């Protein structure tokens, strides 16, 4: 654990496979102890500042409950609670927060804002979500897949829909574990080509594969994991109708799920829009792992906080 103390958690690309395996192993261990009624407090007396420029159900619940289960405490900060909106620099904000806190979780729009905060902070910074990446979510996804299948290398994960922040982090995470990640998106909504190329290099190193296609059936065929996300993310509401038309053939339906492996599970980072990116019979059906996945945000983030803040 000492090797990771003080580290930032901004992108899965920044962490080695061994380090991510340590996160997953600790998450499973802590989860088992919690279920057994054993309470560990490795973060006793520690304070986590949670800055939310974008609101969230799962991110706030999992971080706030998580650090309290670990013996620490959390301070919620909205955009209205800080002076950033009035022109105070990120550098000054980071240096001030570092004097009061033991860690910072930030959920915001600009990825550059998180990177800059980490550059100036003298305490660990955790990326709770940006428009470019969602690493904590994908650690929870990997944990869920590991629990279901017992291993990660060789699994095929098909992501159907918008090539957004979740798709970027799934490519990074899947590549690190030698998975076959296929993203199916319409032209104009595919993942960032530079991030695809980066993930492909990583995948080749670990015996995996990362692909981008336009055909959902091709992507899903034989997959153990079928994943989707909303078609219009927070801040894209004005594009909602345009996106509904673009993604009309990308809904995860029962018919599409039949193309996947017999043991396939369905995953979604939530919130979900039933009848848009996923049919109700899929997300509410027996193959759905979405609520296990949501719970695993708690366990994944507890492990991350323990490793970098204890």
Swiss-Prot record:
<keyword id="KW-0963">Cytoplasm</keyword>
<comment type="pathway">
    <text>Amino-acid biosynthesis; L-arginine biosynthesis; L-arginine from L-ornithine and carbamoyl phosphate: step 1/3.</text>
</comment>
<dbReference type="Pfam" id="PF02729">
    <property type="entry name" value="OTCace_N"/>
</dbReference>
<dbReference type="InterPro" id="IPR024904">
    <property type="entry name" value="OTCase_ArgI"/>
</dbReference>
<dbReference type="InterPro" id="IPR006130">
    <property type="entry name" value="Asp/Orn_carbamoylTrfase"/>
</dbReference>
<dbReference type="InterPro" id="IPR006131">
    <property type="entry name" value="Asp_carbamoyltransf_Asp/Orn-bd"/>
</dbReference>
<dbReference type="InterPro" id="IPR002292">
    <property type="entry name" value="Orn/put_carbamltrans"/>
</dbReference>
<dbReference type="GO" id="GO:0005737">
    <property type="term" value="C:cytoplasm"/>
</dbReference>
<comment type="function">
    <text>Reversibly catalyzes the transfer of the carbamoyl group from carbamoyl phosphate (CP) to the N(epsilon) atom of ornithine (ORN) to produce L-citrulline.</text>
</comment>
<feature type="binding site">
    <location>
        <begin position="56"/>
        <end position="59"/>
    </location>
    <ligand>
        <name>carbamoyl phosphate</name>
    </ligand>
</feature>
<feature type="binding site">
    <location>
        <position position="107"/>
    </location>
    <ligand>
        <name>carbamoyl phosphate</name>
    </ligand>
</feature>
<dbReference type="GO" id="GO:0042450">
    <property type="term" value="P:arginine biosynthetic process via ornithine"/>
</dbReference>
<feature type="binding site">
    <location>
        <position position="229"/>
    </location>
    <ligand>
        <name>L-ornithine</name>
    </ligand>
</feature>
<comment type="similarity">
    <text>Belongs to the aspartate/ornithine carbamoyltransferase superfamily. OTCase family.</text>
</comment>
<dbReference type="InterPro" id="IPR006132">
    <property type="entry name" value="Asp/Orn_carbamoyltranf_P-bd"/>
</dbReference>
<feature type="binding site">
    <location>
        <position position="297"/>
    </location>
    <ligand>
        <name>carbamoyl phosphate</name>
    </ligand>
</feature>
<protein>
    <recommendedName>
        <fullName>Ornithine carbamoyltransferase</fullName>
        <ecNumber>2.1.3.3</ecNumber>
    </recommendedName>
</protein>
<feature type="binding site">
    <location>
        <position position="165"/>
    </location>
    <ligand>
        <name>L-ornithine</name>
    </ligand>
</feature>
<dbReference type="GO" id="GO:0006526">
    <property type="term" value="P:L-arginine biosynthetic process"/>
</dbReference>
<dbReference type="GO" id="GO:0019240">
    <property type="term" value="P:citrulline biosynthetic process"/>
</dbReference>
<feature type="binding site">
    <location>
        <begin position="233"/>
        <end position="234"/>
    </location>
    <ligand>
        <name>L-ornithine</name>
    </ligand>
</feature>
<dbReference type="GO" id="GO:0016597">
    <property type="term" value="F:amino acid binding"/>
</dbReference>
<feature type="binding site">
    <location>
        <position position="83"/>
    </location>
    <ligand>
        <name>carbamoyl phosphate</name>
    </ligand>
</feature>
<keyword id="KW-0808">Transferase</keyword>
<keyword id="KW-0055">Arginine biosynthesis</keyword>
<dbReference type="Pfam" id="PF00185">
    <property type="entry name" value="OTCace"/>
</dbReference>
<keyword id="KW-0028">Amino-acid biosynthesis</keyword>
<feature type="binding site">
    <location>
        <begin position="134"/>
        <end position="137"/>
    </location>
    <ligand>
        <name>carbamoyl phosphate</name>
    </ligand>
</feature>
<dbReference type="GO" id="GO:0004585">
    <property type="term" value="F:ornithine carbamoyltransferase activity"/>
</dbReference>
<feature type="binding site">
    <location>
        <begin position="269"/>
        <end position="270"/>
    </location>
    <ligand>
        <name>carbamoyl phosphate</name>
    </ligand>
</feature>
<dbReference type="InterPro" id="IPR036901">
    <property type="entry name" value="Asp/Orn_carbamoylTrfase_sf"/>
</dbReference>
């Amino acid at each position: 654990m000492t090797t990771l103390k003080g580290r930032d958690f901004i992108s899965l690309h920044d962490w080695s496979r061994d380090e991510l395996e340590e996160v997953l192993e600790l998450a499973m261990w802590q989860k088992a102890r919690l279920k057994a009624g054993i309470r560990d407090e490795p973060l006793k007396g520690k304070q986590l500042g949670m800055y939310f420029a974008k609101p969230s159900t799962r991110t706030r619940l999992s971080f706030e409950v998580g650090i309290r289960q670990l013996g620490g405490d959390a301070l919620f900060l909205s955009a209205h609670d800080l002076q950033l909106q009035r022109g105070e620099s990120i550098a000054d904000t980071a240096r001030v927060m570092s004097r009061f806190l033991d860690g910072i979780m930030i959920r915001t729009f600009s990825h550059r804002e998180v990177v800059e905060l980490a550059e100036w902070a003298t305490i660990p910074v955790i990326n709770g979500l940006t428009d470019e990446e969602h690493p904590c979510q994908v650690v929870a996804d990997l944990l869920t897949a590991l629990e279901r299948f017992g291993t990660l290398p060789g699994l095929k994960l098909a992501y159907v829909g918008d090539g957004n922040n979740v798709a970027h982090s799934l490519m990074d995470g899947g590549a690190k574990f030698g998975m076959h990640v296929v993203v199916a998106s319409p032209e104009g909504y595919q993942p960032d080509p530079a991030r695809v190329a980066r993930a492909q290099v990583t995948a080749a190193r670990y015996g995996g594969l990362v692909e981008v296609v336009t055909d959902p059936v091709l992507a899903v065929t034989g997959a153990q994991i079928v994943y989707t996300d909303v078609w219009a993310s927070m801040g894209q509401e004005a594009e909602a109708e345009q996106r509904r038309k673009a993604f009309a053939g990308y809904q995860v339906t029962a018919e599409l799920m039949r193309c996947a492996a017999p043991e396939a599970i369905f995953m979604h980072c939530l919130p979900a829009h039933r009848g848009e990116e996923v049919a109700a019979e899929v997300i509410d059906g027996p193959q759905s792992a979405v609520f296990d996945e949501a719970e695993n945000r708690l366990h994944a983030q507890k492990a991350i906080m323990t490793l970098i803040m204890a």
